[in-house]
Regions:
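Beta-sandwich/jelly-roll carbohydrate-recognition scaffolds of carbohydrate-active enzymes
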Residues: 2-166
Length: 166
């Protein structure tokens, strides 16, 4: 269970300050985005670590039989289960040939904000690689309400102190 203090109460926003790797699966559910046609869980842009990454499309499902001990009127013979499709949200970032992975190096800052008024998920991360390079990553994720099949991510990377190798 997620402690109530993890998400300060704010009008029109859900804010998470810091990152608890033990509760990623729960927070991925809290930061999910959907428009009725496409749904994406709020997992981290770089993919790892993750609880349960997910991208779901309306009308993309599998059918399965629904067995009953006794048949009866109105008992469906088949059920439908929505399928997790290929994850198109992954962004792999290398910082001087080291993968950007929050499990290694030092996490200096991490904040996620689900802006309920704008319908976007914003994330800010400041991370120091094991070799000492410091970067700041800002991302904004959205699913379009007007073009229902579009999901987009704006991903900005900034070298904080020294310029990283080009």
């Amino acid at each position: 269970m997620i402690p109530q203090t993890r998400f300060p109460v704010e009008p029109w926003a859900v804010r998470e300050v810091g990152l608890n790797l033990d509760q990623l699966a729960q927070s991925e559910s809290v930061f999910a985005l959907s428009n009725g046609h496409i749904g994406v869980r709020g997992n981290l842009d770089e993919g790892d670590p993750h609880g349960l990454p997910g991208t779901y499309l309306n009308s993309f499902y599998e059918t399965r039989p629904l067995p009953y001990a006794e048949s009866g009127y109105g008992f469906p013979e088949q059920g439908q289960t929505i399928i997790n499709v290929t994850d198109g949200k992954l962004i792999r970032l290398l910082v001087d040939d080291e993968p950007f992975d929050l499990r290694y190096g030092a996490l200096r800052e991490h904040e996620r904000i689900l802006d309920l008024r704008a319908g976007v998920l914003r994330r800010t991360v400041e991370w120091e690689s094991p070799a000492g390079q410091v970067i700041r990553v800002r991302s904004t994720r959205m699913v379009s309400l007007t073009q229902r099949s579009i999901m987009a991510i704006r991903y900005e990377v900034e070298a904080v102190h020294d310029p990283a190798r080009q």
